[in-house]
Every structure is written in structure tokens, then in C-alpha cells.
């Protein structure tokens, strides 16, 4: 176990330095830390107002994130029709066979899928398309990397640039927790998962931003750069370690697919779950995330602007949400946040970090993960440890839900039906 004096940075023995009275007096400005929100799709003038125009005031009060007057238009590369027609032709064909081809020019026609969402025969055909897409992806990965993926597993996709605020580390800590559970109990009936990481550029240049470097010294920026590089190295090492471990074979798999592999369409077509887990306070609205939605990929997401927007589209019962919202993150940072306490008091977090500290997953160079540990237990600006327990619980719910094939398929169909 790590000694607290190495990482505590002088903050007292609570997760948050604030009294109940102080919390009750939290200034309203914490509810709107970003006043300049990017809507990155030409459809914004149609889709977003449709969500809020009936009761705009109520929606803004609920989100406390932004108002329509503060939205800045930017030219995106968001084309849901093309993502489905060229990226997932099997699913596009099934949809056309079911509701006709008018949806190609009128996306709102996808709503005609709603009454079909719980139809057993249609669900069976939907799952057959997904399974065929999984096999295509598996073949491509095997040909390019020599890796065989389990096509009967839940394919869990995180396809974003590997940078701090996208929080691949949150995903990794949970993967290590699952690994530890299997090692502690090799007979554990765990849902098989294939975790696919891809380091790709966003669909548009302005959709995501990171404010975390402003006003910080170079050494802090260098620490984050080192941590990002170490995260990529750790992902690749996890893939090798898991592949060689008979205890996790067929249960857990990690795959890294570089952008150069050209498999973006295949990954979205095959995925069951997409991880949109960026730090809530660090993201602008990014409508390129509709690429997963229109492929019927269910999302697990943090409580940021994009994920709230998508939740309104697909319905809260058809996605998974967790963690701290923007005002809560702002509150933590204003009143003091000590990540070490999460390491100290939560065994799952401590066990996962101790694996990293021991160099278990990086045997060739145990020091690789040092910058990751420094980042997590030093300042943890991306609130990875603060969100971890919420995230792990939500992922457990994902596993339980995926075992119910009919209800999961219905969620997938409703995701597509919500795009308009």
C-alpha cells in the first residue's frame, strides 16, 4: 500500500473539504462553468430546439449546463445517413426492408422502428446483423494483428484520442478490477467482454476541448503528456498479459486498434457498448457521438453536456449514466478534493492501483505506470477516482442488462430510432 505522505498534497482527511452549510451556499455560477458551448452539427437548428422548445425553461433548469443563446455554430463532419449506409450496410438493409427507404432522406422516419423494438422476430434479425458485424471485425483484427477476439462477448468500445479528459484510465481501472475478481475466483461467472481501445481524432476539430493546462506550469503539462503515453503503453501491455493468462482467456480481452488500421466503421458496426466517459466539466457538445447511436450501440456516459443531450434523444431507459455532474465537479475543485482518500478507503481502487505500482502489467518496465500513479493520486484533475465507484456500479448494471438479450436489443433499436 502506498504511504499517504507521497501523494496527499496537504489536503485534510475528507474527500471534500466543505461543511454542509458551505455546500448549501454554493454559488449559482458553479452551475454554468462554460458559457460558450459548441453545437457541432448542421441539424442543431432542428434537433436541439425540438428537445427543448416545449418547455425550454424547465430543461435549462434541469441541466444547468448552458442556454441556447450561448451556442456557437461550427461546421462539423456529422452525417448519420452516411455512417449507416456506408458504414453499416447490413443494418441499413434491415432497416430499409422493415420501414422502406425514405429514412435515407428523412431521418425522422427511423421513429417507425419504435413499434418494432420489442418484436421477437425483428429482434432476432437485429441480433443476427450485429453478430455478422462482429465476425467481420474479428476477421479484420485477426488479419491485421493476429488476434482472435471472442465474437460471443460484449464488445466494449472506447474510441477517442488517448488524452487525460477522455479518461481511458477510468476504463482501465475497471478492467483491472474485473481481472482481479477473476484471479481471486477463477470460476467466477463473469460476462465475457472484449475491450477495444482506439486512438482516433474527433470527427471535427472543435468539438472537444481540454482546459486543464491553462495557468499551469510546464512540468504539469509534461506530467500529463507522460501519463497519456503511459496509458497507451499500458493498454498495449494489458492486451498481451490478458492474452497469455489462461484464467482470463475467453472472459476478458483488451485490444488496441490504431486509427491507421482503418476499421472505424467496422468497430462501430460491431460494438455493443460505447464508452463516452469524458470528464463532465471538460467536454463541449460533440454530435459526432451520434455515429455510435445510429449504429445501435448503447452508451455508458458521464454526466456531461453531450451525454445529457443524447439521453434526451434515445430516452434515459436506453442508455447508462453515472458519476459527478458539472456543478459537483466544480464544487469539489473549489472546496478541495483529495484523491488519495479514494485510494485509502475503497479496496477496489487500492487493489487496481497497487497492481500498477507493482508493475504487474508492465513487467518489462515497471516504472511505466509511475506517471499514471502520480497523476491519479497527486491531483487527479479528471476526477477519475471520484467517479470510479459510480462507474463500476454502472458497468455492473451494464453486464446484468446485456445478459437479458431481448431488453438489450430493444435498447439498441431505440437508440437508432431516436436519431432524427
List each language-model region with its residue ranges.
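Catalytic cores of carbohydrate-active enzymes across secretory and cytosolic contexts
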Residues: 1-420
Amino acid at each position: 500500500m502506498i504511504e499517504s505522505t507521497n501523494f496527499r498534497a496537504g489536503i485534510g482527511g475528507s474527500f471534500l473539504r466543505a461543511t454542509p452549510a458551505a455546500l448549501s451556499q454554493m454559488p449559482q455560477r458553479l452551475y454554468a462553468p462554460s458559457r460558450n458551448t459548441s453545437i457541432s452539427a448542421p441539424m442543431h437548428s432542428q434537433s436541439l430546439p425540438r428537445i427543448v422548445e416545449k418547455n425550454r425553461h424547465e430543461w435549462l433548469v434541469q441541466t444547468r449546463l448552458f442556454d441556447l443563446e450561448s451556442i456557437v455554430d461550427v461546421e462539423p463532419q456529422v452525417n448519420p445517413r452516411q455512417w449507416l449506409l456506408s458504414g453499416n450496410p447490413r443494418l441499413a438493409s434491415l432497416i430499409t426492408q422493415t420501414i422502406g427507404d425514405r429514412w435515407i432522406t428523412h431521418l425522422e422516419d427511423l421513429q417507425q422502428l419504435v413499434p418494432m423494438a420489442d418484436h421477437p422476430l425483428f429482434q432476432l434479425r437485429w441480433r443476427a446483423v450485429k453478430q455478422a458485424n462482429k465476425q467481420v471485425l474479428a476477421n479484420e483484427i485477426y488479419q491485421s494483428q493476429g488476434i482472435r477476439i471472442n465474437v460471443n462477448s460484449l464488445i466494449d468500445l472506447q474510441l477517442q484520442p488517448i488524452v487525460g479528459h477522455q479518461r481511458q484510465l477510468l476504463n482501465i481501472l475497471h478492467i483491472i478490477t474485473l481481472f482481479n475478481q477473476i484471479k481471486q475466483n477463477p470460476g467466477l461467472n463473469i460476462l465475457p467482454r472484449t475491450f477495444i481501445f482506439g486512438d482516433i481524432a474527433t470527427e471535427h476539430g472543435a468539438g472537444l476541448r481540454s482546459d486543464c493546462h491553462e495557468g499551469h506550469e510546464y512540468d504539469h503539462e509534461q506530467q500529463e503528456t507522460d501519463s497519456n503515453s503511459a496509458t497507451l503503453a499500458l493498454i498495449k501491455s494489458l492486451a498481451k498479459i490478458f492474452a497469455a493468462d489462461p484464467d482470463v482467456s475467453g472472459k476478458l480481452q483488451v485490444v488496441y486498434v490504431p486509427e491507421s488500421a482503418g476499421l472505424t466503421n467496422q468497430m462501430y458496426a460491431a460494438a455493443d457498448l460505447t464508452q463516452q466517459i469524458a470528464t463532465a466539466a471538460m467536454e463541449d457538445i460533440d454530435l459526432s457521438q451520434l455515429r455510435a447511436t445510429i449504429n445501435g450501440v448503447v452508451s455508458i456516459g458521464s454526466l456531461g453536456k453531450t451525454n445529457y443531450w443524447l439521453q434526451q434523444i434515445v430516452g434515459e431507459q436506453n442508455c447508462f449514466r453515472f458519476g459527478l455532474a458539472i456543478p459537483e465537479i466544480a464544487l469539489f475543485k473549489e472546496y478541495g478534493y483529495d484523491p488519495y482518500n479514494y485510494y485509502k478507503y475503497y479496496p477496489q481502487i487500492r487493489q487496481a492501483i497497487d497492481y500498477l505500482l507493482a508493475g504487474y502489467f508492465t513487467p518489462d518496465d515497471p516504472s511505466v505506470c509511475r506517471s499514471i500513479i502520480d497523476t491519479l493520486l497527486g491531483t487527479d484533475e479528471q476526477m477519475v477516482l471520484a467517479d470510479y465507484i459510480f462507474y463500476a456500479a454502472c458497468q455492473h448494471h451494464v453486464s446484468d442488462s446485456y445478459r437479458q438479450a431481448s431488453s438489450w436489443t430493444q435498447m439498441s433499436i431505440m437508440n437508432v430510432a431516436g436519431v432524427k
